[in-house]
């Protein structure tokens, strides 16, 4: 879970990096292998995007939710 603006910025950079990797794979990967190669990156991008939205829609005065172990 993103706890501060530094983590938010880092997560945004990581999303952009993964999106760039997917864009390269779309061109370079063999068509039959692409879905299995892309699925993990897609899942990670979706997870990070959810975390970004959770962070941005929580008012700055609200504490970050406790993480479940």
Where are these regions (language model features)?
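Short, charge/polar-rich alpha-helical segments
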Residues: 1-13
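General nucleic-acid-binding
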Residues: 2, 18, 24, 32-33
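Non-transmembrane amphipathic alpha-helical segments
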Residues: 11, 15-26, 48, 52-55
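Flexible domain-boundary/linker segments
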Residues: 28, 32-35, 65
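Short, charge-rich amphipathic interface segments used for partner binding and complex assembly
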Residues: 33-61
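Long amphipathic alpha-helical coiled-coil segments
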Residues: 59-69
